[in-house]
């Protein structure tokens, strides 16, 4: 009798992490070599930040961000239009039983990190942080 894996919030398995990194590495090479005719992709330098494969490795969420300035949502939409082409190229480069179906998503983690830095550098927040550090130093003495 086959065991069924129950859905837990442990995170991705070692197999998923390894497959995701394999797909990410291959996609970076493919995107760097190929010329795209899509207007949203012309002249864009693309960073593939993360690939999250499904547990059965048949579907992969690919997170992308433009290098420099650019619209992440337009970039993801353009890559989704080219997903079948990219999947075909990916299948020729990697050795997996199934080539995963690619779903591109905008990676906003850089924007979020920049926003948090801006918040922490505001004068009112900096004053509060300095006051907190000063009171901690007094407590240690």
Curated annotation (Swiss-Prot):
Compartments (UniProt record): Cytoplasm
GO biological process, one term: maturation of SSU-rRNA
Gene3D superfamilies hit by this protein: 3.30.300.20
Self-association and partners: Monomer. Binds 30S ribosomal subunits, but not 50S ribosomal subunits or 70S ribosomes.
A Pfam family per the record: RBFA
Primary localisation category: cytoplasm
Source species of the chain: Maricaulis maris (strain MCS10) (Caulobacter maris)
Keyword Lipoprotein: no
Protein name: Ribosome-binding factor A
Domain of life: Bacteria
GO molecular function: ribosomal small subunit binding
Function statement: One of several proteins that assist in the late maturation steps of the functional core of the 30S ribosomal subunit. Associates with free 30S ribosomal subunits (but not with 30S subunits that are part of 70S ribosomes or polysomes). Required for efficient processing of 16S rRNA. May interact with the 5'-terminal helix region of 16S rRNA.
SUPFAM superfamilies: Ribosome-binding factor A, RbfA
């Amino acid at each position: 009798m086959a065991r069924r894996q129950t859905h837990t919030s442990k995170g991705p398995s070692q197999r998923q992490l390894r497959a995701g990194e394999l797909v990410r590495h291959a996609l970076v090479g493919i995107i760097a070599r190929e010329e795209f005719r899509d207007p949203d992709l012309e002249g864009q330098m693309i960073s593939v930040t993360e690939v999250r494969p499904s547990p059965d490795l048949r579907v992969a969420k690919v997170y992308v961000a433009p290098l420099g300035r650019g619209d992440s949502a337009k970039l993801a939409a353009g890559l989704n239009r080219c997903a079948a082409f990219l999947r075909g190229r990916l299948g020729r480069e990697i050795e997996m039983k199934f080539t995963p179906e690619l779903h591109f998503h905008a990676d906003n983690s850089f924007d979020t990190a920049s926003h948090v830095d801006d918040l922490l550098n505001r004068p009112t927040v900096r004053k509060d942080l300095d006051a907190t550090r000063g009171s901690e130093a007094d407590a240690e003495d």
